[in-house]
C-alpha cells in the first residue's frame, strides 16, 4: 500500500474527522438500558455481533459496491444504491444518523476539493446522502483499494462503538483497548465476507437492533443521538 493511500484512509477513519460520529451509538446505548450490555465482556460480544452479523452482510458490502460504482462513475447505479441504503434504515434515528454523517462528509469532500469535478457534481446531486456513499467517494478520490477502504470503515465503526461503551457502561480505557484488539481479526473476516457478497445478497435484517433503536428515541436519559 502506498503511504499516501494509507494516510488518506487513516484520515477517513480518524475520530477527529468532523462528521459527528462521536454523537451516535447505533443502538448500543439502548442495549445498555435493556441490560444486554453490563460489562466489558458483554460490550465486546455486542460489538462483535454487530460487526459480524450486521456490518459484514449489509453496510460493508453496500460500501464495496458503491466504491466500484464511483470508480466507473455509474451515476444512475450510485443514486439507486444510495436510495436503497437509506430505505434499509430501520428507525428514524438510524436514518438521521447516516444522513447527517453523509452530509457532513460530503461538505468536507467539497471544501477540500477531493476527487474530480464530474464526480463531485454527482455527489452534490444526491440529497439526502448516506454516509457509506460519501465515504466511498472519499476513498475513490484518494485511489484507495476497496478492501483497504472497507477495513478502514469497519475499524472506525468498531472504535466508535468501543468509545460509546466507555462512556455509557461505563468502562475503563484499558477495557476499551482490549475490545478493539479483540475485534481486529473479526474485521478482516467481515471485509472478506463483504467482498464476496453480491448486491442481491446484501442483508440488513437486524430486528433486535431496529427495536432497540426505536426504543432509544423515547429513552429517558441519553448520552447519544442513536
Curated annotation (Swiss-Prot):
Main location: cytoplasm
InterPro entries per record: UreF, UreF_sf
GO cellular component annotations of the record: cytoplasm
Single GO MF descriptor: nickel cation binding
Tree of life domain: Bacteria
Family per record: Belongs to the UreF family.
Name this protein carries in UniProt: Urease accessory protein UreF
UniProt source species: Paraburkholderia phymatum (strain DSM 17167 / CIP 108236 / LMG 21445 / STM815) (Burkholderia phymatum)
Protein keywords: Chaperone, Cytoplasm, Nickel insertion
Keyword match Membrane: no
Self-association state and partner proteins as the record states: UreD, UreF and UreG form a complex that acts as a GTP-hydrolysis-dependent molecular chaperone, activating the urease apoprotein by helping to assemble the nickel containing metallocenter of UreC. The UreE protein probably delivers the nickel.
Lineage: Bacteria, Pseudomonadati, Pseudomonadota, Betaproteobacteria, Burkholderiales
Location in the cell: Cytoplasm
Free-text function comment from the UniProt entry: Required for maturation of urease via the functional incorporation of the urease nickel metallocenter.
